[in-house]
Amino acid sequence: MKENLLIIYFLFLFVISSFAQENTILYWGELLQKNTPADNTYYTHKSPIVKWKGVNGASDYECKTDCSGLINQLIKQAYNIDDAAFNKWMKKKKRAYAKDYYNQIKKGNGFQGFTNIKDAKPGDVIAIKFPKLMDDTGHIMLITEAAQEIEPIEPTVLGTKQWKIKIIDESGHGHGTTDTRYLGNGKYKTGLGTGYFRIYTDSTGEIVGYAWSTETGSKYREADVRKVIIGRLNKKFE
């Protein structure tokens, strides 16, 4: 009898745990990235097409959007909310862009914000806000693994530490030769993929800049110019 009760108890915990995992953008992001065929993803600013096989009648996984379009759809899927509820929360008439995520994280609107890389956890997002007049408003990525401090790689910046952090994003360019979108000979496929982003910090872990990858040819960008923040969703949707 005791054994049966224990089995039922552990099964209950497993079901609860599985349900909790499905209610996260990390779960849906990894599911999408691992299963989307290469022919079913590319980078575009047009109306997003993001599908999970078996969800809402979708016959396959598909991801044709841009960086913010991906995160928008992940949140809607994980929290089962429609466009109206999402746009009301993000204070947008149509859709949210990377700069909007940076602004809302900064304000604490449904997010807890961090600027120390040591606070970053899987399931958080990295939001970057570009200066005005640039073609894009910024970039946003989903963190899948905790940051790891690495030996400094060129370009080096005096007085900084370097970290690599694994992310999923929708981009026109992959993050180095270990990125899943890398085709060889310096070429990349656009669309959904995963790779390592490089963060520069001061001695305490506060973010001072970044580079697109851990490759030596990746340019250093100052966080004073291209503003960087880490966001953790804590919004309660009704």
Task: For the regions a language model picked out, list residue spans one by one.
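Cell-wall glycan-active module
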Residues: 1
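Low-complexity, Gly/Ser/Thr/Pro-rich intrinsically disordered linker/tail segments
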Residues: 161, 166-238
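Low-complexity, polar-biased intrinsically disordered regions enriched in Pro/Ser/Thr/Gly
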Residues: 49-58, 149-160, 188
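...with weaker cross-activation on analogous glycine-rich loops/strands in unrelated enzymes
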Residues: 86-174
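N-terminal capping segments
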Residues: 20-87, 213-238
